[in-house]
Amino acid sequence: MKVELTPFRQSRPYTCVVTCLRVVLAALGADYPENDLASACNTDPSGATLSDAANAVRSLGFNALFLPEATFEMLSEWLQHGVPMIVGIAVDDPVHGVTSSHAVVVCGIEHGQVIVVDPAIGAERQLELETFLRAWRRRDNRGLVVLR
């Protein structure tokens, strides 16, 4: 099961949530510039939260479901209905020895791989299921679903 999405690349290191929102909104037929979404999400140099993103899309007239403790089963069910989920994940930087937060759009699960649109590279990438689950769990399994 896979939802076809148009990837966008984030223009700043802290606009991953905003760019994920742009990807999902584009799939719903709405084209918003990154700067407008960043402002609506109250984005600052530390980024934006999925909760802020949910409030922003509601103010734009969309329905949003912020899931503070989503499950893999919930994620799978949304995908089966053709709805991608924005999730927060932990990303390790072994060079600098730090872990940072990042957001990606989960658009599919196939053959033990989770397919995500990663705004850091502006493209799809595949993650091993266990790698994805570990990274997602480290950010409390947060998710955001946007609907018309």
Where are these regions (language model features)?
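Helix-adjacent hinge/juxtasegments
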Residues: 55-81
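Sec-exported extracytoplasmic/periplasmic mature domains
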Residues: 25-30, 58-62, 137
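Noncatalytic regulatory segments and standalone regulatory/sensor domains
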Residues: 43-48, 80, 90, 97-98, ...
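Active-site-adjacent structural segments surrounding the nucleophilic cysteine of cysteine proteases
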Residues: 1-47, 71, 86, 91, ...
